[in-house]
Amino acid sequence: MAFDKKLLEIVACPVCKGTLILNKDSNGNERLVCRFDRLAYPIEQNIPVLLETEALVLSSEELEKIK
C-alpha cells in the first residue's frame, strides 16, 4: 500500500511549515521532501516520520533531481 497523496494537502514540513513533495529515494523507498530545508522525511509502513531528527539532509545534487 502506497502513501495516500491526499495527505500532502494537509501535512507540512515540521521545520519551516512549507510544502512537502512525495519522492522516492534511490532504493525506491517513498519519502517526503522539503526543498526549502533540503530535508527528506522517511515514510515507514505508510506513515510519514515527520521528525527533524529522523530526516536526511539532501545534497544540492540530490535536490536538483527532485521535481
Curated annotation (Swiss-Prot):
Q: Which GO terms describe its cellular component?
A: cytosol
Q: Which domain of life is it from?
A: Bacteria
Q: Which HAMAP family match?
A: UPF0434 (MF_01187)
UniProt lists the family membership as follows: Belongs to the UPF0434 family.
The name of this protein is: UPF0434 protein Patl_1782
Annotated organism of origin: Pseudoalteromonas atlantica (strain T6c / ATCC BAA-1087)
The organism that produces this protein has a lineage beginning with:
Bacteria, Pseudomonadati, Pseudomonadota, Gammaproteobacteria, Alteromonadales
